[in-house]
């Protein structure tokens, strides 16, 4: 199975997925930037606002998180499901969603000086906690193809206790 990310105008790989979290029961679309420098998948302020996440009541990450822009304070959203589109089959024409349950998902709440970004610039980060299940990557025709092999499928089953 392949996770397919489209490369944008500056060759950043983006994936259109779905996200669901309590108390909401419905899935919401979300754009992820493939970020190998991020150890964890993380929601950024524009998605926190768009999804209507009540971040004030969420637990705060106690350790200091340092980003390229300096230290930040993250909150934790619990019991999240991220669904990512994959393709498979000999002709790579069979489409499916791979469901990735996350017991907690860090999010960066909007600050007091928050100003929304233009929609084409809005994304959250798909980190190595998810990307590690796709060990073989190739670039082809403006896309990043990430292969999800059988060994990784078994590893995913064991780590998620499926």
Predicted regions and their residues:
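Pepsin/retropepsin-fold aspartyl endopeptidases
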Residues: 1-162
